[in-house]
């Protein structure tokens, strides 16, 4: 009986490893992205599970392996991560961010950056995957004073 209780406790901890707000934050980013796109005359993006898996995998890798960049530690670029999920695309783009504790914060920074804004407002892109991973025991990245703790990834694609 004790073994079963320990298993249940471990399963519960695994479920709680990601904050409850993570899904809500991703939904908030999607809503904000689509609001910005509507203002630019672009169609709304739709969520795609394969793109979301690619985004989550990279956000998780950055958080757990303590790095920040479009290329994974093994050198894989976002296009490779998207292909690995079985998604066939004609065009792709990626936005990453770290340190922002809210959807509003990450959107403010992305929209203030010319390259990130360009990806958000690219009317040729029609699908997206969004992920945020929270690493409570994160360590500061090399050259940084404070830990980022929040790692954001949004991938954009056109099939």
Regions found by a protein language model. Give the residues of each.
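A short alpha-helix/helix-coil micro-patch that ends at or immediately precedes a cysteine
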Residues: 23-65
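Short, surface-exposed glycine/acidic/tryptophan-bearing loops
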Residues: 50-101, 120-122
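N-terminal signal peptide c-region/cleavage motif recognized by signal peptidases
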Residues: 17-19
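Conserved beta-strand positions that form and line the central face of beta-propeller blades
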Residues: 44, 95, 155
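Bacterial N-terminal signal peptides that target proteins for export
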Residues: 1-10
């Amino acid at each position: 009986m004790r073994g079963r209780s320990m298993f249940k406790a471990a399963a519960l901890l695994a479920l709680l490893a990601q904050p409850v707000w993570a899904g809500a934050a991703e939904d908030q980013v999607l809503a904000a992205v689509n609001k910005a796109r509507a203002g630019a005359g672009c169609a709304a993006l739709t969520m795609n599970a394969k793109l979301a898996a690619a985004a989550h995998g990279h956000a998780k890798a950055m958080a757990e392996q303590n790095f920040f960049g479009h290329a994974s530690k093994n050198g894989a670029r976002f296009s490779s991560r998207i292909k690995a999920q079985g998604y066939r695309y004609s065009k792709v783009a990626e936005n990453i961010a770290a340190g922002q504790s809210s959807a509003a914060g990450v959107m403010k920074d992305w929209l203030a950056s010319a390259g990130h804004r360009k990806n958000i407002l690219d009317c040729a892109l029609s699908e997206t995957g969004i992920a945020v991973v929270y690493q409570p025991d994160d360590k500061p990245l090399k050259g940084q004073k404070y830990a980022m703790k929040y790692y954001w990834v949004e991938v954009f694609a056109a099939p």
